Structure formats: C-alpha cells, structure tokens
C-alpha cells in the first residue's frame, strides 16, 4: 500500500485531491481509514450497485458502521437485498428512520412527492436528509464514506475524492470509476446487483419516485419524475 502523509488542513484539500487522484480506490480507502477522523462510517442506499462500496470498505474495515436511511417507502426488494448483503458481508448495519411515519406525514401534508418540486424537496428533507444528519451526529462520524461517482449524473461530475463538510470529512473513493469499472469489480468479486437491475432500474430509491430506464431517457430522469436527481443528502450534508 502506498504510504501517504497525514490529512492536511482544509486549505490544502486541493493538493490532497490531486494526489489521491493518482491512487487506487483501495489505497484511498486505506489512507482515509488511517488518517481520517475517528468513527468512520459508510452510508448505503442498498441500491443498484451498492455491493461494490460495501465490499470494498469491509475488506479493510470489517466492522465499519454502515448507515441505511429507511424512508418507509423503499422497494420490498431493497429490504431483502439489504438482508442478503448484511448476512453475506457481516455488515455492522445501523438503520435510521424519519422521526414521523409516512402515514403521519401523509395525513398532514398529503403525498408530498406528488406536489411538484417543492413537495419533493420537503419530502426528502423529512424522510432522507434529517435521518442521515441525525445518524452522522449520533454516531459521531468523523470520516464519512460514500459511493458517489462522477459519471452517475450531471450533478456529480465535480465530485472530489475528499471534501470537508463542517467538522467531517466526506470520502468518495470510487468517484472516478466508470460503469465498466463497477461491472469488472462486481464480476471479479462475484457481487450481486440489486434484484430490480434486471428490470431496467439503474438508480433505485423510493418506490413512488423511481422508474426504470426507458429508451431516450437519461439515467438521472429515472428519479423524482425528472425534476431532479439528488435526494438532498449529498447536496445538504
């Protein structure tokens, strides 16, 4: 493994990212685990290609905390997929849910996801952003690993390998990976795609705001009726 210097101060992140771009994803993970702040954790949606990051991180940190935000509206296949990967990879899974149930929210606000972009944003804040923010704070996560990739959407093309968010470092070790890189890693390690992958679902979130990819559609149009790609977690935290 390449020997790397200790984490530089915030004003040197640009230099650090230039250096990290030359390393493998494995070495980026090892560097972050060694030099990043305490209490590392990986957030996972248990989506289409989530097995890659779960496998990559647990190779080097078998007991790393894995955070799943259960909105209450995930696909049944997602819950079962989470069970499968948790058993196979012996995941230290922590599930966080909204402070109020979906029924509570619907009774007071209706189906927010059907109320245009403002309703979608409010829904995402209540059911995704708040639970993730609470998880990171309660678990005192200092180094937050994500599976963000630049090729996933137009909103992620500038994703850095390491970012500073408040007092936390956010690490995206496969930021530069292509779909081909993902496929090769999964094939090499015999990892499963999400069960809905074979039905054309390439980005999998909640059951009411996710649709399969169709001809002439962009991947990011399969979420939130094409209004937006991001759920707010990686925009606001």
Curated annotation (Swiss-Prot):
Alphabetized SUPFAM superfamilies for the sequence: Adenine nucleotide alpha hydrolases-like (SSF52402)
A single Gene Ontology CC term: cytoplasm
Keyword Nucleotide-binding: no
GO BP annotations, alphabetical order: hydrogen sulfide biosynthetic process; sulfate assimilation, phosphoadenylyl sulfate reduction by phosphoadenylyl-sulfate reductase (thioredoxin)
Domain of life: Bacteria
Active site: 231 (nucleophile)
Keyword terms of this UniProt record: Cytoplasm, Oxidoreductase
Cellular localization per UniProt: Cytoplasm
CDD domains from the UniProt entry: PAPS_reductase
MF GO annotations: phosphoadenylyl-sulfate reductase (thioredoxin) activity
Pathway membership: Sulfur metabolism; hydrogen sulfide biosynthesis; sulfite from sulfate: step 3/3
One Pfam family linked to the record: PAPS_reduct
Catalysed reactions, semicolon-separated: [thioredoxin]-disulfide + sulfite + adenosine 3',5'-bisphosphate + 2 H(+) = [thioredoxin]-dithiol + 3'-phosphoadenylyl sulfate
NCBIfam families given in the database record: cysH, PAPS_reductase, PRK02090.1
Protein purpose: Catalyzes the formation of sulfite from phosphoadenosine 5'-phosphosulfate (PAPS) using thioredoxin as an electron donor.
HAMAP family: CysH (MF_00063)
The family this protein is said to belong to: Belongs to the PAPS reductase family. CysH subfamily.
Protein name: Phosphoadenosine 5'-phosphosulfate reductase
Organism whose genome encodes this protein: Xylella fastidiosa (strain Temecula1 / ATCC 700964)
Gene: cysH
């Amino acid at each position: 493994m390449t020997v790397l210097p200790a984490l530089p101060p915030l004003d040197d992140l640009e230099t650090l990212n230039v250096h990290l771009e030359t390393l493998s994803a494995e070495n980026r993970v090892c560097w972050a685990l060694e030099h990043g702040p305490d209490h590392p954790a990986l957030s996972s949606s248990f989506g289409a290609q989530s097995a890659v990051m779960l496998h990559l991180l647990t190779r080097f940190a078998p007991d790393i905390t894995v955070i799943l935000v259960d909105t209450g509206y995930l696909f049944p296949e997602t819950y079962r997929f989470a069970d499968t990967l948790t058993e196979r990879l012996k995941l230290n899974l922590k599930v966080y849910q909204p402070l109020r149930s979906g029924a509570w929210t619907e009774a007071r606000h209706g189906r927010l996801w059907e109320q245009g972009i403002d309703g979608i944003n409010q829904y995402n804040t209540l059911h995704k952003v708040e639970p993730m923010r609470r998880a990171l704070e309660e678990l005192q996560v200092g180094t937050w690993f994500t599976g963000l990739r630049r090729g996933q959407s137009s909103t992620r093309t500038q994703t850095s390998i390491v970012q500073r968010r408040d007092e936390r470092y956010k690490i995206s070790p496969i930021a530069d990976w292509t779909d081909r890189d993902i496929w090769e890693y999964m094939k090499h390690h015999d990892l499963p795609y999400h069960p809905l992958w074979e039905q054309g679902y390439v980005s999998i979130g909640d059951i009411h705001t996710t649709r399969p990819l169709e001809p002439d559609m962009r991947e990011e149009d399969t979420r939130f009726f094409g209004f937006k790609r991001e759920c707010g977690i990686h925009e606001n935290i």
